[in-house]
């Protein structure tokens, strides 16, 4: 549902700040106190404090950092090029009338991810003297958008990097995006591979086989036993010999949310008995030499290297046993699973990983080589489908805060003649200390319950209930300030931080731009992209602008943990004589969102695709490669079968009737129709306003 694609070549002034950063290793993180309250009161907040708080060094290396101005920077070429100030970049894009929310895609990061993966395999092959090569493929399902796939194919060309298709539509993309060889040799290895996964019908297999005539090298991976007979039949009819693979259901159990990708009840693949059945079918058809690849997948985002080691040991043994049964085994596709360190802890926490790319590669190579050497079987070409590790870092979601809601009411005055429950609450507030704060919390909880009961039975008026609630929250806030200074917080007070958190209303839809955050509680790094030289004194959660209580983010990264609030800055009000107060823009970034999020987003509340800007570095700074405008309201209405012209005509008719009945003036009708027609052509998200702050 992308909007119209507009390509721009706009060079702007460079900001050549160099960031010397390298890919993080796999050493375990050390717990440090990231609580802003722990910062000594007699010293100023620094960007080092922000780096520690938001853990940007952990999850952001080597691409993201903070500069001296307190702004997040991105180094798309890692340690080989300059850095861009994200805050200044967003300001420049807004001056070009590119509204928020927007997605920034950095194609140079894609290039760097491919370079790093291939370099790691090259080092591993050299270290172990592995007697074959590596041929990576990008699984299109991670992000199918055209500019992404085009960039990946372009940057992968020096490495003969191929594509993986998991469906018929993705096969159509792969066939048209990969450049076929003009005069391919039957056993040519130095060309991109096209791995054909997923469930297949006759047309899928026919198309894949005919692609060999074009000069492609498709490998049809059998996911179900029934596909073997179909492939044999179609191959015979077309007179084209296929390259076949089988996907194995490993007994090695994955981990995390995708652990069910393996095992006897996994959705995809063949069990060992089914593999033997497939081999016999191919043997009877005199096509056993067509079986050349073993594929497995133990799930996305594998956090522990031990799981990878176990899977590689099992898969390597299956590979050599297939070869001993007479299959012409030449390829081993280890699938996906190469993780992304979303929280920067470098541990086996589900939002992290306790290994780096080189660790992963070394374990893949050594396991395969050990098994093949022991069995005297030729070592295969190694294939991986590391989509998440390739695509995640290149996309950054930027959105603004349109309003906040704080629980910080003024302390009401309580007089001697007021109800006893109010006097009790005020007395509690006055006497809260570090020695009795837990007891005081229990007291105010009881008083609040009593106040509600008194109100429900008519013994307390509405104004008195309001006073009771204000006093209750004042007591809770005073208790929370004490809790923040303690090394240990009692269990019954742990929810205070959440209960008193501000709500920051974000101009975005979680369902459209971060669906995994809503659907599976995926953690993404989120932080302000500016004001990082200031202490973030607020604690908040994020609520999107959909009319859905699930449209919120209330889980944030911590060190091998999840925290329920995010440290944020108060909105800044600007007062000018003769004009309403204006709130300065406050921009937040959600990072590492380049895999799966865009394509899985939905139209909840009819919030459509957002603006996408492709940025590429050049000697002068950067240029906008592509601008893909987000959906307009008219476009989104069209997706759900409304004709905007019909809607506008209905509105004209209603206005005419209202004027005829003297319920509306001509000026009012014109204003309504102008607003309606103009709105149809506008972005589905909110325009910048003066901002709203409520307490």
Curated annotation (Swiss-Prot):
The keyword Magnesium applies. The modification N6-(pyridoxal phosphate)lysine is found at residue 141. It catalyses: L-arginine + H(+) = agmatine + CO2. The keyword Magnesium applies. Keywords: Decarboxylase, Lyase, Magnesium, Metal-binding, Polyamine biosynthesis, Pyridoxal phosphate, Spermidine biosynthesis. Its EC number is 4.1.1.19. It comes from the Bacteria. SUPFAM superfamilies: Alanine racemase C-terminal domain-like, PLP-binding barrel. Its cofactor is Mg(2+); pyridoxal 5'-phosphate. Signal peptide: none annotated. GO terms for molecular function: arginine decarboxylase activity; metal ion binding. Belongs to the Orn/Lys/Arg decarboxylase class-II family. SpeA subfamily. Catalyzes the biosynthesis of agmatine from arginine. NCBIfam families: PRK05354.1, speA. This is Biosynthetic arginine decarboxylase 1. It comes from Synechocystis sp. (strain ATCC 27184 / PCC 6803 / Kazusa).
